């Protein structure tokens, strides 16, 4: 993970990031990452229930619950750090 993080930090712009992640991940993996990020954003806004978020994004409540756990109680708090920067 450490080496991958170092490489990600070398990306210079959105285009490079998109190209890199399209090479690195399958379309299914990219969709899963995008889905989790969308869930995190909606949870952070705190305006919808888990079921509403799952229905809106056409994802499972399991995914919503997992992302919610990382937002609220996991030690890394990576979602929150970025969400605070962009809001």
Descriptions of predicted regions:
Residues 68:
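DNA major-groove recognition helix of helix-turn-helix
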Residues 51-57:
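Short alpha-helical "recognition helix" segments of helix-turn-helix
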Residues 1-12:
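General nucleic-acid-binding
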Residues 17-36:
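Short, Lys/Arg-enriched anionic-surface-contact patches
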Residues 46, 60, 71-74:
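The DNA-recognition helices of helix-turn-helix-type DNA-binding domains
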Residues 75-87:
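Short Lys/Arg-enriched helix C-cap and helix-to-coil transition segments
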Residues 63-64:
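Helix-turn-helix DNA-binding helix
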Residues 34-48:
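Short, amphipathic alpha-helical "recognition" segments used to contact nucleic acids or chromatin
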């Amino acid at each position: 993970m450490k080496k991958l993080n170092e490489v990600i930090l070398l990306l210079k712009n959105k285009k490079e990031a998109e190209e890199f992640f399209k090479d690195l991940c399958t379309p299914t993996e990219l969709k899963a990452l995008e889905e989790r990020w969308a869930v995190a954003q909606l949870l952070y806004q705190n305006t919808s229930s888990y079921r509403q978020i799952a229905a809106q994004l056409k994802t499972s409540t399991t995914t919503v619950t997992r992302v919610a756990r990382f937002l609220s109680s996991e030690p890394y708090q990576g979602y929150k750090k970025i969400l605070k920067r962009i809001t």
